[in-house]
Design a protein with these regions (language model features):
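Solvent-exposed interaction patches of small proteins and small membrane subunits
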Residues: 1-137
Length: 137
C-alpha cells in the first residue's frame, strides 16, 4: 500500500507540474497571438507582403504560437480538440524548417483568420479552468 501511495503521489505531482507548464504555454499562445494581431492591425496584404519587418515579425510570432502548441501535453490537446493542434504545429514546422516555402498569402491568411480564433479559444480555456485548484495559485 505504501508503494502504491508513493507511486500515486509521484504521478499526481508530475501531472500537476505538467498542468502548470500547460498554463504557461497557453499564456504564451495568447501573448504571441496578440502580437500578431497588433502587427497586422490596420494594414492590407500589399503592405504586409512588401514590408520585410512586418512580414518577419508576423512569421516569428506565428512560429512561437506553434512552438507553444507543440509543447502542450498530449492530454491537454486531446481534451481540447476544438483547435486543430496538428495544423498549428505543422505551420510552426514549415516556418522553422522551410521558411522560404511559406507564401505570403498563406502566412497572411493564418494571421488574419486562424490566429484570432486560436487566441479566443485559448483565452476561453484559461478563463474557464480552475487553475488555483490544479496549480495551487
Amino acid at each position: 500500500v505504501r508503494m502504491l501511495r508513493r507511486v500515486w503521489n509521484e504521478i499526481k505531482s508530475w501531472y500537476m507540474r505538467e498542468l502548470v507548464r500547460d498554463k504557461g504555454r497557453l499564456e504564451d499562445i495568447v501573448e504571441y497571438s496578440s502580437n500578431v494581431l497588433k502587427i497586422i492591425d490596420g494594414i492590407e496584404f500589399e503592405e504586409f507582403s512588401s514590408n520585410i519587418l512586418v512580414y518577419f515579425a508576423t512569421m516569428k510570432n506565428v512560429e512561437i504560437v506553434g512552438e507553444a502548441a507543440y509543447m502542450l501535453t498530449k492530454e491537454f490537446k486531446a481534451s481540447h480538440p476544438e483547435i486543430p493542434w496538428k495544423q498549428v504545429e505543422g505551420m510552426r514546422h514549415v516556418l522553422v524548417h522551410g521558411y522560404s516555402q511559406v507564401l505570403p498569402r498563406i502566412l497572411w491568411a493564418t494571421a488574419k483568420e486562424n490566429i484570432p480564433e486560436i487566441k479566443a479559444q485559448v483565452e476561453k480555456y484559461l478563463n474557464e479552468t480552475d487553475w488555483e485548484h490544479y496549480c495551487g495559485e
